Swiss-Prot record:
Region (Disordered): 27-46
HAMAP family listed in its UniProt record: Ribosomal_bL34 (MF_00391)
Keyword Ribonucleoprotein part of the UniProt annotation: yes
Species this protein is from: Serratia proteamaculans (strain 568)
Biased composition (Basic residues): 31-40
The keyword Glycosyltransferase appears for this protein: no
GO molecular function annotation: structural constituent of ribosome
Entries under PROSITE patterns matching the protein: RIBOSOMAL_L34
Protein name stated in the entry: Large ribosomal subunit protein bL34
One term under GO cellular component: ribonucleoprotein complex
Amino acid sequence: MKRTFQPSVLKRNRSHGFRARMATKNGRQVLARRRAKGRSRLTVSK
């Protein structure tokens, strides 16, 4: 049986990376929330 999680760095960054977050208003809100919370990593991309 094929597993549901088939990792791809490219897809991961395009969906959840920093530039993807910055591209939309809501994405920027996500970053603002994570900054306010004090997250060491804001997004999955390095």
